[in-house]
Regions:
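Membrane-integral, polyisoprenol-dependent glycosyltransferases
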Residues: 29-346
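Terminal, Lys/Arg-rich, intrinsically disordered segments and adjacent short helical elements
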Residues: 1-23
Length: 347
């Protein structure tokens, strides 16, 4: 009798393993399909959008000089070194130029790629966290078709790269903290390192602030202890430090003054556009950024308020923590709170 029972258990276990493998295969196939569709959605017609002045043209010219000069470490424009942003945006554009030539399409392809990759990652993470494929796919569809995400997935700026790496930074950190999963914490730190190579210290500072606030609200000391694994900290420095160390070794104080000083500290403490320096700036901008899903966003916030799950609280801190962080900054840009947009489609 026990032998028959053991056989049934082994058979059931084999079926479960087979189903698990098939689910992973199907999920991989689905994610590849989502990425391909999203890439076509964002890249379609990009060749009809000429590079605009002055912001897009500066990025495009810097990437072009990177290809022509062969210097892929020190960004330069008009023959002079330029420390406006880290190298990630120029690397991606330079790869695109090397493959497709110096065209408008090649200039915008990295943004389309990052937008598609962000959608794909979002779907995977939501499926992983909620165990609901329908919710995950709809989250991706809503984000892809929201106004600001669509625009920035066509724009030649660094925000699409920052979004791509901030999503896994925060969502892997959430999984790692809730499940005590060291692997996901390492992924979070690795992604944060890539975010710092995309737009500077904000790739670490903002996610770090969000996670610390959320851990505090959860009132769980174990979460704080899990937040700083030495493996994650090590992989962060291995990822982000080499380029910064190289730039300082080659360019010295001018790099520190212009990149960390002018383009980070000065913008945070002194407004470049005083006319936009209003405390309500981003709170007015957010509803327009979410179109056509604005109404659904506010409905879901109200609907889920009663339950207040750990994930819901995490998303609330993500959104409003981002808005508050940039509201306190002196310089305000339309795209600064872009990473808050991804939160709104997770609710």
């Amino acid at each position: 009798m026990s032998t028959k029972k053991q056989k049934r258990e082994r058979l059931q276990k084999a079926r479960e393993e087979t189903a698990k493998r098939e689910f992973k295969y199907t999920t991989a196939q689905t994610l590849i399909g989502i990425f391909a569709l999203a890439l076509m959605f964002f890249a379609w017609g990009s060749h009809l959008l000429p590079v605009t002045d002055p912001v897009e043209s500066n990025y495009a010219l810097t990437a072009k000089e990177m290809v022509l000069s062969g210097n892929w470490l020190s960004p330069q424009i008009y023959g002079h070194f330029w420390f406006d942003k880290p190298a990630m945006v120029y690397w991606l554009m330079s790869i695109s130029y090397s493959l497709f030539g110096f065209t408008d399409f090649a200039s915008r392809l990295p943004a389309a790629f990052c937008g598609a990759a962000t959608i794909t990652l979002l779907v995977w993470y939501i499926c992983r966290i909620t165990k609901n494929n329908v919710v995950a796919v709809w989250s991706g569809i809503m984000l892809a078709t929201s106004l600001e995400f669509w625009i920035i997935s066509h724009a030649i700026i660094t925000d699409s790269m920052l979004m791509l790496f901030t999503v896994p930074t925060l969502l892997s950190a959430y999984i790692g903290l809730m499940e005590n999963n060291r692997r996901h914490m390492v992924i979070a730190y690795f992604s944060s390192g890539l975010a710092c190579l995309s737009k500077g210290p904000v790739g670490l500072v903002l996610p770090g602030m969000i996670l610390l606030i959320w851990c505090g609200l959860m009132r769980n000391k174990k979460l704080f202890l899990r937040l700083f694994p030495w493996q994650g900290i090590l992989i962060f420095f291995i990822t982000a430090l080499p380029w910064y160390a190289f730039m300082y070794a080659i360019h010295g104080d001018p790099f520190v003054r212009e990149f960390l000083g002018l383009h980070n500290i000065v913008r945070a403490t002194s407004s470049e556009h005083p006319g936009d320096n209003h405390f309500y700036y981003y709170f007015l901008l957010l509803p327009f950024s979410l179109l056509p899903w604005t109404g659904l966003f506010f409905y879901e916030i109200k609907k889920q308020w009663k339950e207040k799950t750990s994930f819901y609280l995490f998303l609330m801190v993500w959104c409003f923590g981002t808005l508050l962080f940039y509201t306190l900054m002196a310089t305000k840009y339309v795209t600064y709170t872009y990473i808050a947009v991804s939160y709104t489609h997770l609710t």
